[in-house]
C-alpha cells in the first residue's frame, strides 16, 4: 500500500443497531480520511458469531449511506486489499500466529477450561487480578510437537515480555506507558482456529495499510498489546486517536441495553439525519479558530475544518436538549418544499381529512423542533375534541366565554360570505380584521375565540384564520356554529 496516503477504517461488528458512539467513530474516521484526501474503508468484524445479528450488516450499510459517510473500499464494492469481511479472511490469521510461534514470540497453550477456571478462582480468592500464569509458556519443543501430533486442543498465546515497559503515543491522550509485567499473555488463535478480535484487528489493519486508527478510549488498555504485535512482526505502528466515551450522565455510559437511543431510534422519532450527524460530531470534539463559536456544520464543512486536535479527553455527555436545539435549527433552514416533504408522513399519521397542507406546513415549520411531535399537535383536524368553555377566557386578549360567543356570532356572516376565498389566507385575515375594526375591538378579541372554536385547544399550529383556511369553509362554519351552541349551553 502507498505509505504517504492516509487510510482509515470503520470496523463495526454486526450486532443489530448503530450506537451513537459507533456512528461518531465512523464520522471521525471518515473526516480524518477525507480531510487528508485519503481513503475511507469499511470492514465488517464478524468473528464473534455469538453476537452476530441477522440483517445487522444492512443496518450498517444503510446508516452510513443515509448519513453520507460513503466508503471508498468495502465488502460490497471491493478494493485492492479485500475481502473486507473478517469471516472471509479466516485462512490468513493462523499463518501469522504460527510465524510468531516459530520466532519465539508466541506459544501453544494446552491448558483446559477447567484448569483456567480453577486458576482464576484461586487468584480471585487471593485478591489478585485474574491472569494466565504462563504454565505452557516455556514447554520443551518436543513436548509441544508430541501434544500437537496427538490432536490435543490448544490456543496460541502472545509471549508478552516479562520485563520493561511498552509505550505509545495517542493524539488525544498523549504518551502512555504500561509495565509489561502487568499485561497478560493474550490469546491470538482460539481452540476453534478462529482469531481473537485483538489479533485479527492488528493483522487486518496492517494488511489494509491503515495509517490512522480511531476508536473509543476503552481500547487504550489493549493498545500496548497491539503495539507488541506490530513490533513482533516488524510492522509500522499506525497513528492512534482514542475518543472519550459518550455518557448518558456523569456516571453512566450511553447504552442501548439501558434503553438509550441509537441512531435508528433518533431518526424514527423525527430527528433529521443531518442534525444528528452534526450533533454527534460535537460530542467530544470542538472546532478551533474562526469556527470555535459555530455549531451548525454541513458534512463538507466538517471535512474542510476537521482536526483530531479538537477531540477532548473528557467524557461527552449526551444532551437531548442540545440535540433538539440543533434539530430545530436544521428544520428552520429547510426550504418550505423540503420541510413539507419531510413533514407529510407525520401529518398523514394524524390527519385523514382534506386540509391545506402547504399552509399547515408554513405554520408548523417555525414552531417545529422534532418531526415526530407533529401528530400530537394535529389531533383536532379529524374530530373536534371535548373542551371546556373556560378555555375561551384569556386575560391578554381580554376575552371571556361571554365575549367569545359575541365574537363568533360576529364572525359567522363574514366566514359565510361565498365571495371570501378560503384559499387566500391574507384575504380571510383582512376580512376578519375589518370586522374587528368595525366592532372597535383588537384582532385577538375576535380571532382567539375562533382558534378555540376550530380546535378545542389553546396551542395550535397557526392562529384562527390559518386554521380556518387549512380546514376550508364547510368545516370552519360547522365548528363555529357548534361552538356558539356550546357557549349558549
Regions found by a protein language model. Give the residues of each.
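Glycine-rich phosphate/pyrophosphate-binding loops
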Residues: 34-46, 199-212, 233-247, 461-466, ...
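Conserved phosphate-binding loops in nucleotide/dinucleotide-binding enzymes
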Residues: 83-87, 110, 189-190, 208-219, ...
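Small-residue-rich helix-loop
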Residues: 336-439
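Charged substrate- and nucleic-acid-binding regions of tRNA-handling and nucleotidyl-transfer enzymes
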Residues: 426-488
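Active-site cores that bind ATP or allylic diphosphates and position pyrophosphate for catalysis
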Residues: 102, 107-242, 248-254, 262
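N-terminal Rossmann-like or analogous alpha/beta NTP/dinucleotide-binding catalytic cores
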Residues: 2-125, 222-235, 275
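Residue-level signal for inorganic ion chemistry
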Residues: 29, 60, 100, 104, ...
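Structural motif
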Residues: 18-20, 266-274, 313-319, 352-360, ...
Amino acid at each position: 500500500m502507498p505509505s504517504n496516503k492516509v487510510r482509515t477504517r470503520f470496523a463495526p461488528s454486526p450486532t443489530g443497531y448503530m450506537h451513537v458512539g459507533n456512528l461518531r467513530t465512523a464520522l471521525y474516521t471518515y473526516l480524518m480520511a477525507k480531510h487528508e484526501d485519503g481513503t475511507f474503508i469499511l470492514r465488517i468484524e464478524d468473528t464473534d458469531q455469538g453476537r452476530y445479528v441477522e440483517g445487522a450488516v444492512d443496518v450498517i450499510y444503510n446508516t452510513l449511506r443515509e448519513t453520507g459517510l460513503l466508503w471508498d473500499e468495502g465488502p460490497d464494492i471491493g478494493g485492492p486489499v479485500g475481502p473486507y469481511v473478517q469471516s472471509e479472511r479466516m485462512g490468513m490469521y493462523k499463518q501469522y500466529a504460527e510465524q510468531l510461534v516459530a520466532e519465539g514470540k508466541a506459544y501453544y497453550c494446552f491448558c483446559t477450561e477447567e484448569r483456567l477456571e480453577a486458576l482464576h478462582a484461586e487468584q480471585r480468592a487471593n485478591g489478585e487480578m485474574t491472569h494466565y500464569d504462563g504454565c505452557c509458556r516455556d514447554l520443551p519443543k518436543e513436548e509441544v510437537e508430541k501434544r500437537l501430533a496427538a490432536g490435543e486442543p490448544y490456543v496460541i498465546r502472545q509471549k508478552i515480555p516479562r520485563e520493561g515497559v511498552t509505550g505509545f503515543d495517542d493524539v488525544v491522550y498523549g504518551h502512555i506507558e504500561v509495565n509489561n509485567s502487568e499485561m497478560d499473555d493474550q490469546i491470538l488463535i482460539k481452540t476453534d482456529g478462529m482469531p481473537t478480535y485483538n489479533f485479527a484487528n492488528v493483522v487486518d489493519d496492517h494488511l489494509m495499510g491503515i495509517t490512522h486508527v480511531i476508536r473509543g478510549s476503552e481500547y487504550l488498555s489493549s493498545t500496548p498489546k497491539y503495539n507488541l504485535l506490530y513490533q513482533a512482526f516488524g510492522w509500522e505502528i499506525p497513528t492512534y486517536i482514542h475518543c472519550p466515551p459518550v455518557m448518558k450522565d456523569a456516571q453512566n455510559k450511553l447504552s442501548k441495553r439501558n434503553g438509550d437511543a441509537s441512531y435508528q431510534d433518533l431518526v424514527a422519532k423525527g430527528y433529521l439525519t443531518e442534525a444528528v450527524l452534526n450533533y454527534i460530531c460535537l460530542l467530544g470534539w470542538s472546532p478551533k479558530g474562526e469556527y470555535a463559536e459555530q455549531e451548525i456544520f454541513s458534512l463538507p464543512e466538517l471535512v474542510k475544518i476537521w482536526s483530531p486536535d479538537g477531540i477532548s479527553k473528557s467524557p461527552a455527555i449526551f444532551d437531548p436538549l442540545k440535540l433538539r436545539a440543533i434539530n430545530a435549527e436544521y428544520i428552520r433552514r429547510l426550504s418550505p418544499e423540503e420541510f413539507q416533504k419531510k413533514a407529510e408522513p407525520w401529518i398523514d399519521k394524524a390527519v385523514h381529512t382534506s386540509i391545506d397542507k402547504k399552509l399547515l406546513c408554513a405554520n408548523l415549520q417555525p414552531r417545529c423542533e422534532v418531526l415526530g411531535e407533529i401528530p400530537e399537535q394535529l389531533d383536532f383536524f379529524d374530530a373536534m375534541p371535548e373542551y371546556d368553555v373556560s378555555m375561551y377566557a384569556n386575560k391578554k386578549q381580554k376575552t371571556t366565554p361571554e365575549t367569545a360567543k359575541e365574537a363568533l356570532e360576529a364572525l359567522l356572516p363574514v366566514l359565510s360570505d361565498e365571495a371570501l376565498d378560503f384559499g387566500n389566507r391574507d384575504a380571510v385575515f383582512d376580512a376578519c380584521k375589518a370586522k374587528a375594526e368595525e366592532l372597535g375591538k383588537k384582532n385577538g378579541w375576535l380571532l382567539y375565540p375562533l382558534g378555540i372554536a376550530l380546535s378545542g385547544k389553546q396551542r395550535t399550529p397557526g392562529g384562527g384564520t390559518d386554521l380556518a383556511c387549512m380546514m376550508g369553509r364547510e368545516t370552519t362554519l360547522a365548528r363555529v356554529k357548534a361552538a356558539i351552541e356550546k357557549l349558549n349551553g
